[in-house]
Amino acid sequence: MLENLSTEHRNEKTMNLDEMSIKEVLQSMNEEDRTVALAVEKEIEHIEKVVRVVIQSFEEEGRLIYIGAGTSGRLGILDAVECPPTFGTDDKMVQGFIAGGLKAFTKAVEGAEDREELAEEDLKSIGLNEKDTVIGIAASGRTPYVIGGLKYAHSVGASTASISCNKNAEISKYAKLNVEVETGAEILTGSTRLKAGTAQKLVLNMISTASMIGVGKVYKNLMVDVQSTNEKLVERSKRIIVEATGVSYEVAAEHYEKAERNVKAAIVMVLLQCEYGEALEKLKVAKGFVKKAL
């Protein structure tokens, strides 16, 4: 029942929200937001377990699939679409599904989140299999669309995890691993796009970033698999080579072009003073880890 969910409770500190000054509203929001990172911190051990499972999926050429409705679904898609430019992944490696389809990203689709079968259809459409990991996201922890997706994922042998913002969430029963970040009452009663949404975003940031580090997408703290899809990212790529190797910008730019805009290869070429082909071979043997290639 909704009334039993902490995310649906009224916040005792904001009973007079409509009477507050603009500054008081903003201060109140900021005060509540400061509690979110602390709530996430309590779940780090559970998040770590999820990351390990995702890394295993990636190592087996499986995928990470997020499913959610409303804000939760949008956050999953947001995290997924940032992976290709940041980590050089293809657009199938991390995917996000929202109840009602992509049109629901910008406009609510009535009733979609209440239909378990829609998630099964979405996951069937990509040929979900036992190598994949499905993460169901629901602030309330009870969304039927997410439950349906987790049930189907389990039926095909995929790994499953859930992210919710209430303890003892319903969706936790349908996932092997559970992250339950208890964010409590919102300043605007039931508006889980606020603290709950922020908590979900923080957890998704952790999962995707730590998982990509785990499969060699990062050297030191540099995103060496960045895709140079625009002028800003071309410049960033060259700067990454400078930071990783200590050479001048000109030398970095030269090796960037010699390496056919492959930042990892350019770094290996500079540090080992080798040719492009040899750098690629070393990276292949090292399974993409720059540090191991060196």
UniProtKB/Swiss-Prot annotation:
Sorted alphabetically, the keyword list is: Carbohydrate metabolism, Lyase
Q: Please give the CDD domains that the UniProt record associates with this protein.
A: SIS_Etherase
What Enzyme Commission number(s) does the record list for this chain? 4.2.1.126
Which superkingdom, per the lineage? Bacteria
Q: Where does this protein act, in terms of pathway?
A: Amino-sugar metabolism; N-acetylmuramate degradation
Q: Which InterPro entries match?
A: Etherase_MurQ, Glucokinase_regulatory_CS, MURQ/GCKR, SIS_dom, SIS_dom_sf
Kindly list the GO molecular function terms attached to this UniProt entry: carbohydrate derivative binding; carbon-oxygen lyase activity; ether hydrolase activity
Q: Biological process GO terms, please?
A: amino sugar catabolic process; N-acetylmuramic acid catabolic process; peptidoglycan turnover
Query: SIS domain: from which residue to which, for each copy?
Result: 54-217
- Function in brief: Specifically catalyzes the cleavage of the D-lactyl ether substituent of MurNAc 6-phosphate, producing GlcNAc 6-phosphate and D-lactate.
Other remarks on record?
Answer: A lyase-type mechanism (elimination/hydration) is suggested for the cleavage of the lactyl ether bond of MurNAc 6-phosphate, with the formation of an alpha,beta-unsaturated aldehyde intermediate with (E)-stereochemistry, followed by the syn addition of water to give product.
**Tell me, how does this one assemble?**
Homodimer.
**Family per similarity comment:** Belongs to the GCKR-like family. MurNAc-6-P etherase subfamily.
Query: Under which name does UniProt file this protein?
Result: N-acetylmuramic acid 6-phosphate etherase
Q: Which organism is it from?
A: Bacillus thuringiensis subsp. konkukian (strain 97-27)
Q: What is the lineage of its organism?
A: Bacteria, Bacillati, Bacillota, Bacilli, Bacillales
